[in-house]
């Protein structure tokens, strides 16, 4: 009647340790339906997940082997990579989407809080450099192009400046 070590590690807040994925484990939205990250007004093609709830922010990219896109974490000015499986680029974003700092974090490391940051964007290692993201860049979300005409009742419901405060 002894417990196996794996049953002790299960938690409703943490993803399965054996799961192999390149999307946030808490999201059910397919990458094709997500907005795209823009840098200085230019669309990058990167799918953009947004972690808005406490649960989503706490889990972040835990349980992933990489990410096919980027994760925008709202109401956040620091992150850690404890229990992460891969190195990531971390972009600290301030008001109106302005980049405050960019760094790369290896697994089991803790980032420094950035007092001017209101959000953090996590992406695959090397993506920030490849996309030209640097201090002073402006990040935003470009809405996906609908395959059919949008419902007028829901038009304009998407905020394209995620996590910003005006």
Language-model segments: residues:
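Compact, glycine-rich, soluble single-domain proteins
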Residues: 2-166
């Amino acid at each position: 009647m002894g417990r196996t070590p794996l049953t002790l590690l299960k938690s409703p807040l943490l993803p399965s340790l054996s799961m192999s994925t390149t999307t946030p484990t808490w999201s059910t939205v397919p990458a094709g339906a997500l907005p795209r990250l823009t840098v200085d007004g230019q669309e990058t093609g990167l799918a953009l997940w947004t972690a808005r709830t406490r649960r989503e922010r706490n889990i972040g990219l835990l349980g992933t082997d990489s990410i096919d896109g980027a994760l925008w974490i709202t109401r956040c000015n620091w992150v850690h990579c404890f229990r992460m499986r891969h190195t990531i680029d971390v972009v600290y974003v301030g008001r109106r989407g302005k980049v405050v700092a960019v760094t790369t974090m290896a697994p089991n490391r803790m980032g420094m809080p950035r007092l001017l940051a209101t959000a953090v964007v996590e992406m695959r290692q090397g993506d920030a450099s490849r996309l030209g993201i640097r201090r002073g860049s402006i990040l935003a979300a470009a809405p996906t192009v609908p395959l059919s005409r949008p419902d007028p009742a829901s038009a304009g419901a998407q905020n394209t400046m995620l996590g910003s405060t005006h």
